[in-house]
Amino acid sequence: MSERNQRKVYQGRVVSDKMDKTITVVVETYKKDPIYGKRVKYSKKFKAHDENNQAKIGDIVKIMETRPLSATKRFRLVEVVEEAVII
């Protein structure tokens, strides 16, 4: 039996938790400009499955690629790395 492919794991910040069992995570990373070689920061939003609704806005979370769970969800919550500070 063959092994499963290596799945992508990203760490990002929760920007929305308004949907039931779904969070929106923004992942910030750097790309190198092809002409000038300067590192440019860019971000991308992913929707992730949160089975127990445990992540809140501002939390730092780890998400992992999985099978398509809906039209837009392709990731699931692995763990909450750091909880947001509520003032």
Swiss-Prot record:
Q: Which InterPro entries match?
A: NA-bd_OB-fold, Ribosomal_uS17, Ribosomal_uS17_bact/chlr, Ribosomal_uS17_CS
Q: Which Pfam families match?
A: Ribosomal_S17 (PF00366)
Q: Which GO terms describe its biological process?
A: translation
Complex formation:
Part of the 30S ribosomal subunit.
User: Which CDD domains does this entry report, sorted A to Z?
Assistant: Ribosomal_uS17
Keyword match Ribonucleoprotein: yes
Residue spans crossing the bilayer: none
Protein name per its UniProtKB record = Small ribosomal subunit protein uS17
Q: Which GO terms describe its cellular component?
A: cytosolic small ribosomal subunit
UniProt keywords, alphabetically: Ribonucleoprotein, Ribosomal protein, RNA-binding, rRNA-binding
Family, according to the entry, reads as follows:
Belongs to the universal ribosomal protein uS17 family.
Q: Which function does this protein serve?
A: One of the primary rRNA binding proteins, it binds specifically to the 5'-end of 16S ribosomal RNA.
* Gene label: rpsQ
* Annotated GO MF terms: rRNA binding; structural constituent of ribosome
Q: Whose protein is this, by species? A: Bacillus velezensis (strain DSM 23117 / BGSC 10A6 / LMG 26770 / FZB42)
